[in-house]
Amino acid sequence: MCGIVGMVAGRDVSGLLLEGLRRLEYRGYDSAGIAVVGSDCALRLLRCEGRVQSLCALLGQSPLCGTMGIAHTRWATHGKPCAANAHPHCSESVAIVHNGIVENHRSLREMLVTRGYFFHSQTDSEVLAHLLHWELRYTAHLLLAVKKVLTQVRGTYGLLCMDAASPGRLIAARSGSPLAVGLGCGENFVTSDPLALAHVTQRFLYLEEGDIADVHRDSVCVHDAQGNVVARPVVTYQMQLCTQDKGTHRHHMHQEIWQQPHAIRHTLNAYMSFSSSSRAQVRTFGEDRVLDGTSCKTFERLFRRITRVRIIACGTSYHAGLVARYWFEAFAGVGCQVEIASEYRYRTSVVHAREIVLTISQSGETADTIAALRLAKTQGYLCAIAICNGARSTLVRESDAVLLTHAGSEIGVASTKSFTTQLVCLLVLTRMIAQAKKILTQEPEDALSAALQRLPQDVEHVLECEADVARCARHFVHAQHALFLGRGELYPIAIESALKLKEISYIHAEAYAAGELKHGPLALVDAQMPVVAIAPASPGVLFEKMASNIEEVRARGGMLYIFTDVPERFGPVCTPEADAPEGACSQIVTVPSVSPLTAPIFYAVPLQLLAYHIALLKGTDIDQPRNLAKSVTVE
């Protein structure tokens, strides 16, 4: 969500700070600001509503120069988006930027007003600036003053402070919101996301819960929650400077949809080795807790013991978990329960014997998922495993074992390749457990190996259907509402596809298990209601049931959009090229046939394209949809 960048150096930092903010734009924000301290020890501030580009324009009109500074992109939680509510917040010589929520801000505000402080914003964060200014009246030591402030605060924070009266010094504090210190030569940095500092350093130390860092040009001193000086490990984080280059694509989301064959292949290669016979050997956990190709008998023994899996996640990651429930129960013979992290935290739950907890997050910094993990670790689970794209994230560091998704940087707020690579990891983990428990017989094991080996190529082939999907979007674009239907493992894909449409096109969409049509949703169907049906040919009775549900929609005059590999089963049919009257007949997107084992991953891709092309026609901000953030780091 919000982004923090801070620097203390021997050169002007204003341009470097702005570049850091540009690199954080993908996280989502509504305002931005910068404060610097110059050689005259004067604090100078610029803030604006809107994009970093607007802040750059302001800086062009009123240049700021200084060797120490902090900057911020804000995603509104308390107070509307406007310049006054943007960070940094100042109190005379003090400036702060803050990610998180100050839960007791009202009582603190009332106290500060009685002390003569005037508030310029509606935010909870401004109280931190005034509190720090108050404490500095009694001690000139910035670190001690920050510590005193934090004893009075309830809530979460990634906090970065500076005082013009203490030049060459930044104080960073972390509780519930990530911060990292970037290490340079004669200069040091602080950020909420290392990507922001890729242009100045690749060496970082990550603050742990309760840490406070005293950052100078030539030194960094970290104190833990007990006040002890500690040495946090320094890691080198190789980041590409061109991460945000869209290439030939109009949007990052479109680029990332097309990157999925590579991302899936990369993820599979990290965990599986395929022989010429299409049989795969699954690699197991290494000593660094990451599935990296090194055999580890400890986890094989653990997997043999597992009887249940509890999946905890939010948003798109939650939908990945819903798919995995089918896999764990069908292939590995273990019960599976999927929880929304924000709900799990606040209800009484029963942990079963020999149950593991599995968290899923793209960023690894999702506040509710991290809090749920911390709760789960006190409840007696056998093990805590994370599936994550953030190799050095909080979720990764606090889990017992990790499967990295190897999706690469994902800039678009709406997750695409992160989702499909999460599903790949979940299917690999399912297979590992099934192998450890000796449940898979040779035939289904070979079928799964072959399906996974073909998956990157299958996704490449379905991307070739983009023109048909785009033509369907023309008929869809003026709709106010939409309904998505699926069965079995494809029901969660319908849920995820409805979310994608909501996120980037702002069309209200709902998803239902197709068998639930007659229990309410059928009342919504008319000639103005688009209904998207996911209908692959599948073994057993599910396909015939789905075909029957589609006929129910057709009988009510619904606008049908069918994604299938057997178009001949759904006549009368209008091809995507036809400009048929709405509701007159079905629009069919014909996709290649794939294994039912990987169909959920495969069908997610054309439905991502559908949402993208509808949003493109509507002219919305596809990469940064309104009111949304890439990484939800507050509850």
Swiss-Prot record:
It comes from the Bacteria. InterPro entries: GATase_2_dom (IPR017932), GFAT (IPR005855), GFAT_N (IPR047084), GlmS/AgaS_SIS (IPR035466), GlmS/FrlB_SIS (IPR035490), Ntn_hydrolases_N (IPR029055), SIS_dom (IPR001347), SIS_dom_sf (IPR046348). It catalyses: D-fructose 6-phosphate + L-glutamine = D-glucosamine 6-phosphate + L-glutamate. Keywords: Aminotransferase, Cytoplasm, Glutamine amidotransferase, Repeat, Transferase. The keyword Cytoplasm applies. Residues 299-439, 472-625 form the SIS domain. Its main location: cytoplasm. PROSITE patterns: GATASE_TYPE_2, SIS. Its EC number is 2.6.1.16. Catalyzes the first step in hexosamine metabolism, converting fructose-6P into glucosamine-6P using glutamine as a nitrogen source. Homodimer. This is Glutamine--fructose-6-phosphate aminotransferase [isomerizing]. The gene is glmS.
